[in-house]
């Protein structure tokens, strides 16, 4: 109920996106109702969801400058599994919200958040048999929490020459995975993995309309934190690591249409670096890309793209330490992916189309 548009890009990603190699899935959220309150309740076989939206600070105005969307979902799988006699108890909550505020005719503020709480546990079944015993011994205990919050300020220039967007956000993942000798009483740890990932980001994008060109440029700045604590009592392995570093990048992109909008051209680049790895710099991750799209007949388009993309290694690799406690992968290169794509698209209606796409993607410096 939040989503107004979804776009999947399997190549020719916008230069503003850092770290994708194979695809970008972009969600566009709608705004809440600015005139009245609406409620929606959905019930399925596994969960129930509640959505609420409406205006804030409306007063006597017909339309408020501020609106909100709030959705909460709760599972009742644990009750269902108990009813049918299974010892496992999956349990989850998730939520998302959006607040939109119109400051004036040229400035808007958006606050977006989403998160989840997942827990997986076991209980002694009413009928204890070999199958139930095997399930109890093998079932892990999982506790996972995710949270993302972002604030975006969008400013349109009064001379209609463009706009700018500034976004500050944080996303955090906490994951605890445990196996017990006595799962029912949660006693006697066999294995436990406790991991945390947190990213705090600042992104600025300036979009200008220069003649028939649309030019976007900007930068991103990110603080990355990762920690992992592992206990393996079976093999007497005890492992801990923690890293904290800055990642940054710059980008630019220019688009224009020619021949009465029959030919669309897009060219761009981005460069990325960080304070953790030692074998990379901005020039080493220079990633150009170009895209062409031509309408050769009514409702028919052929397109071609070529581009290079980079992605930093996963935190589990960057944070790995040897038996002496030294970080061994600071010399990791960014993974590189070169894309060559040719596609054909037919528009069935203003809101529907069908496309056929062929691509060649070559990866290098892939961590194994």
Regions found by a protein language model. Name each.
Residues 100-118, 140-280, 295, 355-356:
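Face-selective signature of the C-terminal outer-membrane beta-barrel domain
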Residues 10-12, 29-31, 43-47, 56, ...:
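Transmembrane beta-strands of outer-membrane beta-barrel pores
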Residues 1, 8-11, 16-39, 50, ...:
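N-terminal periplasmic accessory domains that precede
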Residues 3, 34, 46, 57-63, ...:
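Outer-membrane beta-barrel channels and translocator barrels
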Residues 44-76, 85-119, 141-164:
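Transmembrane beta-barrel wall of Gram-negative outer-membrane proteins
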Residues 125-132, 174, 227-230, 280, ...:
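Surface-exposed extracellular loop regions of Gram-negative outer-membrane beta-barrel proteins
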């Amino acid at each position: 109920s939040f989503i107004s548009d979804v776009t999947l890009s399997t190549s020719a990603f916008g230069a503003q996106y850092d770290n994708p190699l194979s695809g970008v899935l972009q969600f566009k959220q709608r705004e809440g109702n600015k005139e009245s309150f609406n409620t929606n309740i959905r019930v399925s076989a596994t969960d129930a969801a509640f959505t609420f939206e409406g205006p804030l600070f409306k007063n006597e105005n017909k339309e408020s400058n501020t609106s909100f969307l709030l959705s909460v979902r709760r599972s009742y799988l644990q009750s269902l599994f108990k009813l049918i006699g299974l010892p496992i108890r999956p349990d989850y909550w998730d939520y998302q919200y959006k607040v939109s505020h119109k400051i004036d005719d040229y400035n808007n503020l958006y606050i977006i958040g989403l998160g989840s709480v997942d827990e997986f546990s076991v209980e002694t079944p009413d009928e204890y048999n070999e199958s139930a015993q095997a399930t109890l011994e093998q079932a892990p205990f999982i506790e996972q929490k995710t949270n993302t919050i972002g604030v975006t300020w969008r400013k349109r220039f009064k001379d209609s020459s463009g706009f700018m967007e500034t976004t500050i956000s944080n996303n955090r993942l906490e994951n605890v995975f445990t196996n017990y000798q006595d799962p029912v009483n949660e006693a006697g740890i066999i294995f436990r993995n406790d991991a945390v990932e947190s990213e705090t980001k600042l992104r600025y994008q300036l979009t200008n309309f220069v003649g028939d060109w649309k030019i976007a440029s900007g930068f991103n700045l990110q603080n990355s934190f990762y920690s992992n604590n592992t206990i393996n009592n079976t093999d007497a392995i005890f492992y801990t690591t923690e890293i904290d570093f800055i990642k940054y990048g710059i980008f630019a992109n220019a688009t224009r249409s020619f021949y009465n909008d029959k030919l669309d051209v897009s060219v761009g680049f981005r460069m990325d670096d960080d304070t953790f790895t030692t074998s990379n710099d901005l020039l080493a991750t220079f990633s150009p890309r170009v895209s062409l799209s031509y309408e050769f007949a009514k409702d028919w388009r052929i397109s071609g793209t070529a581009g290079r993309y980079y992605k930093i290694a996963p935190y589990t690799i960057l944070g790995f330490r040897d038996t002496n406690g030294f970080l061994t992968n600071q010399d990791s290169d960014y993974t590189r992916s070169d894309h060559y794509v040719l596609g054909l698209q037919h528009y069935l209606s203003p809101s529907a189309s069908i496309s056929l796409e062929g691509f060649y993607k070559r990866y290098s410096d892939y961590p194994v």
